[in-house]
Amino acid sequence: MSIVKEQFFQRVEQHLHAIYQDVELPIAISELTEELITLILGDNPLRDPTPHTNRWDEQDVVLIAYGDSIINHEDSDLAVGTPLEAPLKTLHRFIKEQCDHQLNALHILPFYPYSSDEGFAVMNYAHVNEALGDWQDINAIAKDVKLMADLVINHCSSRSIWFENFLTDTHPGKDYFKTACLTDDLSQVVRPRTSPLLNTVTTTSGEKHVWCTFSHDQVDFDFENPEVLKEFVGIIRHYLDNGIRLFRLDAVAFLWKQLNTSCINLPQTHEVVRLLRTLIEHAEPSVVIITETNIPNQENLSYFGNANEAHAIYNFALPPLLLHTLLSGDSTALKHWMMSMPPAQNGTAYFNFIASHDGIGLRPIEGLLQPSEVASLVSTTMQFGGRVSMRTSHDGTHTPYELNIALFDALQGTHNGADKFGLERFLCAHAIMFAMEGIPGLYIHSLLGTTNDYERFDNSQHNRAINRHRWQESKLLAAIAEKYSHHHQVFNGVKQLLAVRKRQAAFHPNATQFTLHLGEGLFGFWRQSIDRQQSIFCIYNISSQPQSLTLADLNLINTQQWYELLSKTVLDEELKTMQLAPYQTLWLSNRA
């Protein structure tokens, strides 16, 4: 056995001992280790990963979309019925022909057969939903962009073959799902839904109560059974073989359940993430693991581990904080949060986003905003046509959990109501995200300036549907071509920001970041490239009033020429102050 393989074996074995230390296993840990290594490598050679390697740079921007976000359909007014081609082909063509090479990565939201929750109740992990396309379509996309896929690891569909086998006490699936007794004390369990946690089902061996963190159609796995772990390692190998290089671990914080605990962020959950990291990076070192943990900020940060868990974590506090900042015209909370965020170690990065297929989560800002500020966010969201999703707190009360609204509508005004600065405010939000430390993730409906889809909401009665519009391709192309439409202005404005961003070494996800103190109406930070050759001062007017910037407040080294990157202008050396229009952005750099 080579040194690399021996060390690999020992690390996997250590992870398994930590995970299953309180579980009586049917097989020896050493045997399980061998099986997992065989599954993850398949017919491929063992790789020796280099630790603390940044697998990203300033060129990386991830587009987030459903496989059928754009549909080629003969009816130009409706994105319904049978498409003229596989929607994955339509999405692929749109990226290649319309996005000017500004997007080099794509997160296709669950593209597997499913029974509910827009893909997150997976019926078969090994198949592509026939309504979207097939594995050939996935492979074709993976040849053009870095491809990100969801590993829906906490639960699967109640209509999956595994759960059907659970009901009939047959394999595989017989012991795959978490059960509990109605008499168990489950009062400490933390979850983001108001539905009953347990669902009673009838099996051939009698009545059982299965654990459902999210919905009764999404039944939680029991990872105390190592067969479940083996299934998922095999699934990961299958995805690797089909070109997936970024893995989003969906709802992973809830993975391990233990009575008399919160059943969230348990030590075994973190150890499973570390195990998957070890297995994957020895199979394909270029892979990036991103944990989707929509939880309070400090808990979210824990998924970095010691640079040995997730390569990247979602910056869940950013969307609600940035929304608060732009609706209130006050940068205080955003500034304090940014100052508190530790720089990501090499080999780790923040995954920044300000809109997604889900709503804008409120749990991540617990302790960051005052209750009155959260209440204002809820009120303004409703005023601008959005919806608010609730969760059940420990005391049984219902608490706002998520704001459901298209970002373009959410930023149509301030807490004082709608105004004329919606477009400027929207582009300012993206200019902030694109310049921050981390990898930017751009939701397709933010790229397109899509508004609230009330028809989709009315048809489904699911709050999240309001921000999950399906575009008909010809209608979309007409909208982004019409130069006076907000879709055209958003689409081209965002692409222009990205074109500038991708040329700046100081916007590397791991470049230095320092928060500036410029008063309530301005927000700013300084970025410096890893080689220390480029500095960029990123300044934003986050208010609806003009703001004055005193250049003496910045450390503009007077022996260097300074440039404003977005306007492509040279700063006058005699200039003392600059006036920023409402929601204007300045990127001041010592390199043009």
Question: For each predicted feature, which ranges?
Answer:
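Active-site and adjacent substrate-binding regions of carbohydrate-active enzymes
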Residues: 2-592
